[in-house]
Amino acid sequence: MKKNWLKTSIFVSLSVSLMICGLVAAFSVTAARGQVTDIKVEIKEVEPFVYCSLSRTGSFSDIEAAVGELLQQMQIQNVFPMGSMIGIYHGDPTLSDPEKIQWEVGFPINEQALVQAPLQKKQWTFTNVAVSLHEGPYEKTGETILKMRQWLEDNGYVQNGPILERYLDADPSSTSPDRLRTEIWLPCKKG
């Protein structure tokens, strides 16, 4: 069981580094104005959950090292994931200096799990989220986020929390890039 978890984690680590490249590229593009029609967005009520993560500030260039450290520390501390790997991106990368962006990589965990530094135990508390499923290469998730933000604006919502991405494929290395699935959450409220 532990061996399979580690193998899957390594595959996820490599794939997530590609996903971050997509965020960086897409956030340098401005969203088109007008009605967004080629994306499905739903407003959902989600349950708060506990997760462990490694937090970073700055460019996404060390994502691979951060994921590797996360997985290593979880294994050392016997902290087991209770769901898909997540990435959380604080602030607005389209407006922020890339060297000041705060981001996290992590996994949902059992709330009784004991977590020690450098891992942090946190709780996702945003319960009203806009949700869209991005299907395709991780490098293009940023395009979906921009479309979701436009959808929020067009429908009278404002984003009021960090971007959360859930990486749904257990073994991204055995999935065609065009079939990779990333669920994107944007916390929101009526504007």
Functional labels for PLM-detected ranges:
Residues 1-2:
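N-terminal hydrophobic targeting signals that begin at the initiator methionine
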Residues 5-191:
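A solvent-exposed interaction/effector surface
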